[in-house]
């Protein structure tokens, strides 16, 4: 079974850019969020009724990706992941009222069952950046943003509540506020953890 690294953090922090930078340095099997390919993402942006379908689609996708990456001979590297989609996005959706209590409970049950069947990632790289940096990065994006810069504090709170439950050796926290697109400071630190 291959190793798995999850890169997590709020929208706009640089998860995809870091995964790309790491992939240029070492051969990883990678998995991305695939916003454009997700059938409910654009629908949800237009109509909040699609909140549950969007969340379940992502949770299922991420579980499928984890299973595939674990089967690879290479170390797996995920842009986001199952844990981020539940602890960050599903909780954010519930807080905003985009998921009802029973819908959120369905997401929780699916996540807990799935996580009990799939090994926890070997390393979770938690990216943080200042709100100003995240706001600027989100403004430059050319894709659908469900979470906004205003959601960053709440999103980070949800992640922190989960992250404190993890063993310290499984977690690498990086403030990437000053990083460029090559992540010259962070890439060596992550590679040293492998």
Specify the residue positions occupied by each region the protein language model found:
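Pre-Walker A (Motif I) flank of P-loop NTPase domains
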Residues: 1-4
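Conserved substrate/cofactor phosphate-moiety recognition/catalytic segment
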Residues: 24-67
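P-loop (Walker A) phosphate-binding loop of NTP-binding proteins
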Residues: 10
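Conserved lysine of the Walker
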Residues: 15
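Hydrophobic anchor at the beta1->P-loop junction of P-loop NTPases
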Residues: 7
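Post-Walker A alpha-helix
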Residues: 18-19
């Amino acid at each position: 079974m291959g190793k798995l690294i999850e890169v997590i953090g709020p929208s706009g922090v640089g998860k995809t850019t870091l995964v790309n930078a790491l992939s240029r340095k070492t051969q990883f099997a990678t998995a991305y969020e695939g916003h454009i390919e997700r059938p409910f993402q654009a629908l949800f942006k237009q109509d909040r009724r699609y909140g549950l379908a969007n969340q379940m689609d992502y949770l299922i996708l991420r579980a499928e990706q984890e299973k595939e990456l674990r089967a690879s001979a290479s170390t797996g590297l995920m842009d986001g992941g199952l844990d981020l989609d539940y602890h960050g996005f599903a909780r954010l959706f519930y807080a905003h009222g985009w998921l009802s209590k029973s819908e959120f409970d369905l997401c929780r049950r699916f996540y807990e069952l799935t996580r009990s069947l799939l090994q926890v990632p070997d390393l979770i790289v938690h990216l943080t950046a200042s709100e100003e940096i995240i706001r600027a990065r989100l403004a430059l994006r050319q894709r659908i943003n469900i979470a906004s810069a205003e959601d960053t504090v709440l999103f980070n709170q949800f992640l922190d509540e989960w992250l404190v439950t993890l063993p310290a050796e499984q977690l690498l926290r990086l403030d990437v506020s000053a990083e460029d697109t090559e992540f010259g400071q962070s890439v060596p630190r992550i590679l040293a953890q492998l």
